[in-house]
């Protein structure tokens, strides 16, 4: 089988090689940060946590799995799931935040934007309350009358499970 980069052009009777230039164009763009640096913006509707700050790494929970972002990461757009965002500063310190949902965009110029529906630092959360909310939601799920109610309760369960995991 021929590689997908080779296509037969109708009417020409010969093979033509197609070339992807995206990587070259992305590399030619001016970086948002210096070489080996990553510009990070992280905000919720009520608060800005980082605004174009240079960081070493960001770990994010997404619908397709958790992953770490470093400078020169492949461009991507992902939907966040409830979980822990860990920001590794250039000085070696880490900051941990719980996010409920949102999106993360990784650009070719090593800039990253994380927009969260809700986000709080871990020290603002109470493990006991998260466990109590989880137990309450699990018991409510057993008595849910319709599919819509079950779906809403399941979302609460997933969020509280992620909270408990982040705090333990």
From Swiss-Prot:
Keywords: Acetylation, ATP synthesis, CF(1), Hydrogen ion transport, Ion transport, Membrane, Mitochondrion, Mitochondrion inner membrane, Transit peptide, Transport. Its main location: mitochondrion. One of its GO terms (molecular function) is proton transmembrane transporter activity. The keyword Membrane applies. The modification N6-succinyllysine is found at residues 136, 165. It is found in: Mitochondrion; Mitochondrion inner membrane. The modification N6-acetyllysine is found at residues 136, 165. GO terms for cellular component: mitochondrial envelope; mitochondrial inner membrane; mitochondrion; proton-transporting ATP synthase complex. It comes from the Eukaryota. One of its GO terms (biological process) is mitochondrial proton-transporting ATP synthase complex assembly. Residues 1-22 form a transit peptide. Belongs to the ATPase epsilon chain family. Component of the ATP synthase complex composed at least of ATP5F1A/subunit alpha, ATP5F1B/subunit beta, ATP5MC1/subunit c (homooctomer), MT-ATP6/subunit a, MT-ATP8/subunit 8, ATP5ME/subunit e, ATP5MF/subunit f, ATP5MG/subunit g, ATP5MK/subunit k, ATP5MJ/subunit j, ATP5F1C/subunit gamma, ATP5F1D/subunit delta, ATP5F1E/subunit epsilon, ATP5PF/subunit F6, ATP5PB/subunit b, ATP5PD/subunit d, ATP5PO/subunit OSCP. PANTHER family: ATP SYNTHASE DELTA/EPSILON CHAIN, ATP SYNTHASE SUBUNIT DELTA, MITOCHONDRIAL. Subunit delta, of the mitochondrial membrane ATP synthase complex (F(1)F(0) ATP synthase or Complex V) that produces ATP from ADP in the presence of a proton gradient across the membrane which is generated by electron transport complexes of the respiratory chain. ATP synthase complex consist of a soluble F(1) head domain - the catalytic core - and a membrane F(1) domain - the membrane proton channel. These two domains are linked by a central stalk rotating inside the F(1) region and a stationary peripheral stalk. This is ATP synthase F(1) complex subunit delta, mitochondrial. It comes from Bos taurus (Bovine). The lineage of its organism: Eukaryota, Metazoa, Chordata, Craniata, Vertebrata.
